[in-house]
Amino acid sequence: GIDMALFNDKFTATIDYFDESRSGIYMERAFLPGMVGLDGNKPYANVGEVNSKGFDGNFSYKQKISDVKFTVRGNITYSKNEIIERDEENNVYAYQMKKGYRVNQNRGLIALGLFKDYDDIRNSPTQKYGPVMPGDIKYKDVNGDGVVNDGDIVAIGSTSKPNLIYGLGLSATWKGLDVSLHFQGAGKSQFFTYGKCIWAFTEGQWGNILKGTLDNRWVDAETAQKLGIPANENPNASYPRLSYTDNGNGNTTIYEYKNNYRNSTYWLRNGSYVRLKTIDVGYTLPKKIVNKIHFNNVRIFMTGTNLLTWSSFKLWDPEMGASRGEQYPLAKSITLGLSVNL
């Protein structure tokens, strides 16, 4: 690590690098011969090994310019890990093993957009997740065997947990006025969106489709003309065609094999965000006024919490880390107050 102090301690910083190997991690055995007879109830053992490396740091800068005093401070943590051993059976496809990848690595199919027409379907590898139609999601045949199935599931995107976490604080005073802001953020993470709020007509829902799903779905010209709505045959539309069939929801659970509702890059979203976590603005009355009313100190203040968030993901709060969007969001609040010291 490095510790530094510059400009008569106006600027201070600390940076630490870490490289940790952790072995003997207690976990369920993943690979046991069938002759052992424990396929349905595998024992736990100290068989896992993970290597983690990264850095964390913080800094602070203080300065005074005329009557203005201000402080800037920040912190950052970045980490990346790799699974070295987890007692897993050798897979036909090395890319489907957990070893060599990160903990919480997202996995799924690679989406190539939506099928444009039936010629596109006939000229593409056969997809084994139910019959497909134009407007359904088209996937990449990773292993080149002519079919798309679970053998084409690969590591995609980043991890479901942030690898990067940071914060920034700003504070300043000028005579009786004081302002303080605190930003926080996270990056290097992605998550899948799913559930009835995203997948229309699933989980027993027959209506209440989100407007964004309805307006941005794929819809062919013939259907659009019948319904009197604009057509959208864009192979990169935000949502596939609406469906009641087994390719959509059918009469089975959402966890069974269906083409459009598979974990894939089509439903993978960026979990990065920056949030103005708190802002505090206050004014302390001058001593000559306070003394007249026989108080020691009087401060009027306003505090705001979770007022602004910047993120490419707009459907719900990315900090929740929720794929379904059904958790109660963080509340925004503004508080006005008066602090009096006698």
Name each model-derived stretch.
Residues 2-6, 11-19, 55-63, 70-78, ...:
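Membrane-embedded beta-strands that build the outer-membrane beta-barrel scaffold
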Residues 26-32, 41-50, 87, 100, ...:
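Extracellular/periplasm-exposed beta-strand and loop segments of Gram-negative cell-envelope proteins
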Residues 50-52, 163, 274, 331:
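Membrane-spanning beta-strands of outer-membrane beta-barrel proteins
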Residues 89, 193, 231-342:
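Membrane-interface anchoring segments and C-terminal beta-barrel signals
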Residues 64-160, 191, 196-248:
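Conserved small-residue
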Residues 22-28, 68-69, 81-87, 188-194, ...:
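Outer-membrane beta-barrel proteins
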